[in-house]
Every structure is written in structure tokens, then in C-alpha cells.
Design a protein with these regions (language model features):
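Acidic anion/phosphate-binding donor-loop and adjacent secondary structure
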Residues: 37, 136, 165-166, 178-195, ...
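Donor nucleotide-sugar binding/catalytic pocket of nucleotide-sugar-dependent glycosyltransferases
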Residues: 148-186
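Conserved acidic donor-binding segment of nucleotide-sugar-dependent glycosyltransferases
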Residues: 318-330, 336-344
């Protein structure tokens, strides 16, 4: 057994929980271990009560190659558990406690655990979303409690970093969302299409959970301008918004033959197939913190089209890896037509290949050291 003091104790979703936060936590902590930084992850015995979880399951069947210990210890709704966890942290005595934050449901457990910590343990808030995408009662008050127990903060984008800076005088380090290290290998486009039983049309895809703020209705509307083009739309991900309204919209616009839907949470191999089969990945969000899909699209060297909003547009504009559209269906349809042109595809793919070397977990950890 390793008796060396834990450098980083990380509270976050991790296996067996599914999703991008869990996936990236594994890449992050594996990289910490590879840098000889002793790391342990404490995840949740209960994260979301079933009553408020909108999906089919919170759990993943995927197996991760992890180099660190994961313990399921934190219950988000049990105050007695919070005190117990705080005592366990003090006993372990890590140099840093990293609290990964993406939802107000974490504020109370993080606050009460932090309240009873040994003050020598430095607490870092690692922030995915600062403002919840859907309105939550008392969010500002809850977030202030969380802020009180953190010594400093790290964000995955300037957009989120600026939001945090508006709320606190504590140190905030704005970084970037790295490309995960455990992604399945790139697949040839023809093989990916064959795997998914797709025809030879151009394909553009929306990948991820379908929620109201993701702008999928706008994306569907853009295809009324593309009816006569050899382009099909893939919507792949679990619907957290009622699917019927999207199906009704598709039928009303006469787009049944143009839209392919997979209403399932996608494991990483399926995400790989859809992105590799696509000519473009589209993120038509109405608001965003940053995107976990952008680094995945970069890994698979697929150009992007994103909304003209903070949190999405900056990386695309900086790297010239796709197009930014002005938040109307008509403008999105024009961006799609422009971006599937051969010369544009070659340019964007070339720019992605040059840029993606910047977005590594290794570089993220080097930047993190300054905090």
C-alpha cells in the first residue's frame, strides 16, 4: 500500500457514473498520476435522487483504465454523511481537495464538508458550469455557500472564469477543456457510415443530451432551407426534453426523410462513429459555459458550427476550426452549406490538426500548478 501523502483528493462524478464529467475526471486524474502526483477520487454513493433525474439511468457500462483509487462515499442529500466525509478527509489529510462543481445540488454537501475541514487543506473549486443552464431556486445563495469553502477556483473557459470573477475576489484561473485521453481511435468515414447504416449523403450531427437550451429546434428549422440539398441531419443522444415536440416539428416541416434520430445515451464508441461519419458537428445552443463536445470533435478532426454565444464561439474563432452562425435558422443553413464545401472542409480539418495539440491534460496540469 502506498503510504505517500495524497497530493490531490478529487470530489467528482467518476465511474460508475456516466457522462462527460465522469469521462474527463478519469483523464484528468490519470494524468495527475502520470505526473507522479498522488491522487485519489471520491465519488458519490448517491448523486441525483431518482425523483429529479430526467434520464434512463445515471450509470455507465463502460470500463475505464484508471490508475487511481475511486471510493463511492458522498451522498448529496444526507447531512450526516457530509460530517462523516469531512472527518474522513481530515484523516486522509490531502494537500489539496478539488471540488468539481457543475450543479447547485453540490453546494450544500460541499459547503458542510468544507466547513469542518482542517484549514491547512487547500480547497480548489474546479468549475464546469457556474450558472445552471436551467433555473434553480436559490441558486445564488447556494453558490455563495460553496464559494465560502474554496480558497481558489479553476474554470474550463474564459467565459466561466469571468462569471466566477464577477462573484468573488478569490483567485480564479481560467484554463481550457482538454481532449480526453481515453477516447476510441479515429475511424475511417466510410467505415463509420457503414457501421451506422448511413447512405452517401453529407451528414451533419448534433451529439449529446437534448435539453431545451441546446437549440435543437432551431437546428431542425434550418433544414427547411436544405430540403433540396444532399444533406441529412443526425440527432444522437438521450432526450431530456419531450421527444414528441421534436418529432412533430420534423413532420410539420416535411423533414422525416432528412432527419435521423437516436434517442439513447451514447457510449464513447457510438459517439466516435457518429462524429467520424459526419462532415460537421453542430452546437446550436442558446447558452453555454463551454463545450465538452468541441474537444471530442477536435480529436476526431471534424469541423464545427456553433452559435454566436460566449463559451462556444471563442475556440472556433481562434482556431478557425469551423463557423459561427448568428442564431437564426436561415443563417445556420447558410453556414452548413458553406462548411461542407471541399475547400472549407480541408481548411478546417487542417486547422484542427494544428490546434488540437494545445488542448492536452498534460498542459492543463502544468497550468494548474501556478494556483
Amino acid at each position: 500500500m502506498n503510504s505517500k501523502r495524497i497530493k490531490f483528493l478529487v470530489f467528482s462524478a467518476s465511474y460508475p457514473y456516466r457522462g462527460g464529467i465522469s469521462d474527463s475526471t478519469h483523464s484528468f486524474c490519470n494524468e495527475l498520476i502520470d505526473n507522479n502526483l498522488n491522487t485519489e477520487v471520491w465519488t458519490f454513493s448517491l448523486l441525483y435522487p431518482n425523483l429529479i433525474f430526467p434520464g434512463k439511468t445515471q450509470y455507465s457500462n463502460e470500463k475505464y483504465n484508471q490508475k487511481f483509487i475511486v471510493r463511492r462515499l458522498i451522498n448529496t442529500i444526507n447531512p450526516f454523511n457530509w460530517i462523516k466525509v469531512s472527518k474522513k478527509v481530515n484523516k486522509l489529510n490531502p494537500e489539496f481537495l478539488i471540488l468539481r462543481y457543475w450543479s447547485p445540488i453540490l453546494c450544500l454537501p460541499y459547503f458542510f464538508i468544507g466547513l469542518f475541514l482542517n484549514k491547512k487543506i487547500k480547497v480548489i473549486g474546479l468549475i464546469d458550469n457556474w450558472t445552471n443552464h436551467e433555473k434553480v431556486p436559490f441558486e445564488n445563495i447556494l453558490r455563495k455557500l460553496f464559494m465560502n469553502v474554496c480558497n481558489s477556483f479553476i474554470s474550463f473557459s474564459d467565459n466561466v472564469g469571468n462569471e466566477i470573477k464577477f462573484s468573488t475576489q478569490k483567485k480564479v484561473l481560467s484554463l481550457f477543456h482538454p481532449i480526453n485521453t481515453n477516447l476510441p481511435k479515429i475511424k475511417d468515414k466510410h467505415k463509420a457510415k457503414a457501421n451506422l447504416d448511413l447512405d452517401k449523403s453529407y451528414h451533419v450531427s448534433f451529439i449529446g443530451l437534448i435539453r431545451k437550451y441546446k437549440g435543437v429546434e432551431l437546428l431542425i428549422s434550418s433544414f427547411k432551407y436544405l430540403k433540396n440539398e444532399n444533406i441529412k441531419l443526425i440527432i444522437a443522444g438521450e432526450f431530456y426534453d419531450p421527444i414528441d415536440k421534436y418529432l412533430n416539428q420534423i413532420n410539420k416541416l416535411g423533414l422525416k426523410e432528412k432527419v435521423i434520430i437516436e434517442n439513447n445515451f451514447l457510449e464513447s464508441s457510438k459517439i466516435r462513429d457518429y462524429i467520424c461519419a459526419s462532415d460537421l458537428v453542430i452546437q446550436p445552443y442558446t447558452r453555454a459555459s463551454q463545450s465538452g463536445i468541441t474537444p471530442v470533435a477536435y480529436f476526431y478532426e471534424t469541423p464545427l458550427i456553433v452559435s454566436n454565444i460566449n463559451g462556444l464561439k471563442e475556440i472556433i474563432q481562434r482556431d478557425k476550426s469551423g463557423e459561427v452562425f448568428n442564431n437564426t435558422a436561415k443563417d445556420l443553413s447558410k453556414a452548413i452549406l458553406n462548411s461542407i464545401k471541399r475547400d472549407r472542409q480541408e481548411l478546417y480539418i487542417s486547422n484542427i490538426r494544428k490546434s488540437k495539440v494545445k488542448y492536452t491534460w498534460s498542459r492543463f496540469i502544468k497550468e494548474l500548478e501556478i494556483i
